Every structure is written in C-alpha cells, then in structure tokens.
Amino acid sequence: IDAPDFNLGVERWLKQGGVRTVHDVSPSVWAWRENRAAKIAASADRVLCLFPMEPPIYARHGVDAVFIGHPLADAIPLQPDRDGARIALGEAVDAPLLALLPGSRLGEITRMLPTFLQAARLLQADVPGLRVMVPAANAQCRAAIEALVGDLPALRVLDGQAQAAMIASDVVLLASGTAALEAMLCKRPMVIGHRISGLTYAIVKAFGLLKSAHVSLPNVLAGETLVPELLQDDCTPANLHAALRHWFRDADAVAALQPT
C-alpha cells in the first residue's frame, strides 16, 4: 500500500511471467511526472483510476485505464448533517466555526500550522465569537499541535474526527491533498494554503514537473478556480485571512458552491 515503485516492480515480474496485472490505484500523473504513465504500461495490463481526468492521460501513452471513482464519495453522506456534527462535537449550532487542517505529518504541521494559527487570530478580530478546531491524526500530531497553539482563544484540538470537524465547520483552512477532496464532499467552503521547501519548489519549477494549473482537487476536477489556492510566497497569514474572511462575509459565494 502506497509503495508504487515496489508494487510496479512486482507487477512487471508477474506480467513478464504471463500473469495479467491490474494496478489499483493510479499515482497522481495528472499533477506531476506524467511520464510515469508510460512506465506503468510495462508493469500493468490495466490501471484503475480514482479521478475522471486520469484515463485520457493514460490513453496518450497507450495504457488501458478505467475510472472507478473515489471511495470517499461513498463514505460521506450526500447531505452532510452540519448541526448533528456540531452537537456530536459539543459545539453550538449557531457559533461561527473554523477548521484548521495543516496536514497529518509532523513536518506539515510544523511548517503550516503557525501560519494557519496567525490567520485564525486575524479572523477572530473580524468574526465575533469565532471558534477554531484542529483535528490531530494521532498522539504525536496532537503533541506537535499543542506545542504550537499558544494562547489562541476558543481553540480545541480534536483526537481524529477530521471529517466531523469539516462537516461542522463554516469554513475549512487546509493544506491541500486528499483533505481538499474530503472538504469538497462535505460541501464546505475552503481555502488552500500550502508551502513546500524552497529547493523542492525550485526543482519542480525548473523541470516543469507540475502539469496541472491547479493543485487542489476541487479546482482540478472543476477545471477552474472554485476555491482559493495560496501557495509558497502567497501563503501568508494576511492572504489566508482575507480569503477566509471572504467566505464568512459572502453568503452568496458560499451558496454558489452548493449543488443545485
């Protein structure tokens, strides 16, 4: 699981021995290193894809690929119960609520959470009574989060419960990844804030490794900017605050995100 180089090696060995192979699921060739699609052809007879934009990429490389859908689409109710999620979390149904999801790895937390917390502090000055929730994926993450939160008022660290926090929240501030897809399925307005190391970013830019105009799945799937993406130097407390404030103040913009 989540070891594509190892798995593809095993698949290639099996395929060379005459065993038909299926690769489940496709790596993110839509985002970067599209050339991996051609390499997968040597290992897999068929690739199962979570997203509809992936099979056409494989078709360009002569690979049989099928869109099967994402399991999160079945795991999250079509109409999430916001009030029920708030009651389950012990939150008032009428209080403004912001969820922060800086990532589930310690490096992501230490890199992104301080900026997210500064943005939340600025937002509390604009949104009276704003409460903040930060789900922690495990005990290590909780310790890292608690070491950073300082004296930010009205903040709770949760043990897991990320999906419940998203459903309960008015707005989600997150660092992209699968969490953005989850927030979309929870029908929550969101702001994407993300930074990678300067060296990694320079390499990605220099070699043109990033193929998509967007990095978050809601925007990639829509083919347009539905939610703001603030990346690298644009990912500042002031910019995040402005984007979050927009969602809290513009009910029409929030309503436009909801399916009819």
Residue ranges and their predicted role:
Residues 1-260:
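Nucleotide-activated sugar donor-binding and catalytic core shared by glycosyltransferases
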